[in-house]
Amino acid sequence: LLAVCLSGCMTDVQSVQCRRVNSLSPFGPAVMEEQGVGLSIKAFEQGVEDGSLAGHVGFAESVGMIAEALGWKVDKFEQQMKPIVTTVDRKSPYGFAKAGDVAGVNMTGQGYVNGELKIDMIHPQQIEPEMEGTHTGDYIVLKGTPNVSMAINPEVDGGIGTIAMMVNMIPHVINARPGLKTMLDLPVPRAIMGDMRDMIEK
């Protein structure tokens, strides 16, 4: 959604790249398991093949939403899931990966329009990324007129960001007309510092 908002000051958009580099360290055992933290490379590859590893979920939906907002028709979507292998032992509160094993997953996804790559999603996530010099952050690059780029360092904390978004959208969801809605249908998210009841339409 942030990429869509940034495109509002552009007269044309040629491509969109969204990259989120984040730490899995704050998350619990369920996330460690679904991201393959601590697995051997062979076990990780087997999990990708049999579908037991979730990795990041939502690239197809994000690509679809960006395309819909910009008026593009995606004719092909691809997604990849690769292990991030650590060269040092890494330990987080709920995860451990010894050197040579998997510390996280690098998810990538692409949306093509008329055979041309238009939407590029990149999402490496791992425990204790700083131990090998990786700094977290959220990055958006829009190519077009004018070019637009955005960087947030360090990353927006995934847990806090999710909780805040859900709470801040409460009055907008209440005010929405009945039906299935996406974030494109609702007002731009914002922190609500006042009384939410004042925002409910009578």
Give residue spans per PLM region:
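Short glycine/serine/threonine-rich phosphate/pyrophosphate-binding segments
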Residues: L1
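Active-site-lining helix/loop region of Rossmann-like oxidoreductase modules
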Residues: V4-D138, I163, N168
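C-terminal helical cap and adjacent loop that interface with cofactors, partners, or active-site loops
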Residues: I127-K202
